[in-house]
């Protein structure tokens, strides 16, 4: 399937389905990248900041704590409902990252925490981010690092490559490990109208602390979207092999009564010309 609308519908229905699980499953991982993202983007008191693909609103909440004015948008109504529940003092709207409703030059900063690879047309989202930024404003976003730089991504990727049937039909979307090459990322940003020479591209690593060895597999299967769709289309036999391989790999990261799995992401910041 190569229709971008198919991928958008796939992602939208997926996040509507698992939004209620995000806080309990993924928050302890993805929120670890917010503070370094805000530092890299130099978010300051009094700024106007748009949190794109905001999910439950964690980035917007961190922005607000710095004294900046945050607005969050997400295409998932279920995510927006949770963001409003968790952070009642912040404005959250349903919206499309690839067709923002905001006027030109509205925000000082546009931020996106692990959202680009969930969009059918990341280039459109970059162009829209530039459009709504004020002159000299900054775009900051995070991307999962490629498996060879990120132990968690590698163990999951290795298990899937070894045991999954990759011929199952899934909607065609952007690469999961999007813009992992610095030159590719800079070129995409320049094509969207940003000042490519201003780009910073840093790797940041954290430990994802989980209670059991099967937690990561269960998270991907039941609280993911792209990974969940791939896993759901496997035979019971293949799924069992993937589960076993993931759990065996996680065991090496045992710490105390749980596990601490290293995982890396890229923090990318660029200025509007």
Which residues are covered by each model-predicted region?
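Class I SAM-dependent methyltransferase SAM/SAH-binding core
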Residues: 48-100, 109, 124
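Conserved catalytic/acceptor-binding region of the Class I
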Residues: 124, 130-134, 138-211, 231, ...
């Amino acid at each position: 399937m190569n229709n971008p609308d198919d991928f958008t519908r796939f992602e939208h229905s997926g996040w509507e389905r698992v939004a209620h699980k995000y806080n309990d499953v993924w928050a302890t991982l993805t929120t670890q990248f917010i503070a370094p993202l805000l530092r890299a983007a130099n978010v300051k008191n009094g700024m106007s900041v748009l949190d794109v693909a905001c999910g439950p609103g964690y980035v917007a909440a961190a922005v607000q704590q710095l004294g900046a004015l945050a607005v969050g948008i997400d295409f998932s109504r279920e995510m927006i409902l949770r963001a409003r529940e968790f952070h009642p003092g912040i404005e959250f709207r349903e919206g499309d990252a690839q067709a923002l409703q905001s006027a030109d030059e509205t925000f000082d900063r546009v931020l996106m925490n692990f959202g680009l690879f969930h969009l059918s047309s990341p280039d459109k989202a970059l162009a829209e981010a530039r459009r709504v930024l004020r002159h000299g404003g900054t775009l900051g976003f995070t991307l999962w690092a490629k498996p060879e730089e990120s132990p968690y991504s590698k163990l999951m990727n290795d298990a899937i490559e070894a045991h999954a049937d990759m011929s199952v039909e899934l909607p065609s979307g952007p690469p999961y490990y999007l813009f992992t090459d610095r030159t590719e990322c800079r070129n995409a940003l320049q094509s969207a109208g940003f000042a490519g020479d201003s780009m910073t591209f840093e790797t940041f690593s954290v430990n994802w602390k989980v209670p059991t060895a099967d937690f990561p597999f269960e998270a991907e299967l039941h609280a993911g979207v792209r990974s969940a769709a791939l896993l759901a289309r496997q035979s019971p036999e293949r799924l069992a092999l993937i589960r076993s391989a993931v759990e065996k790999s996680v065991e090496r990261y045992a710490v105390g009564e749980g596990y601490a799995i290293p995982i890396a992401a890229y923090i990318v910041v660029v200025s509007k010309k």
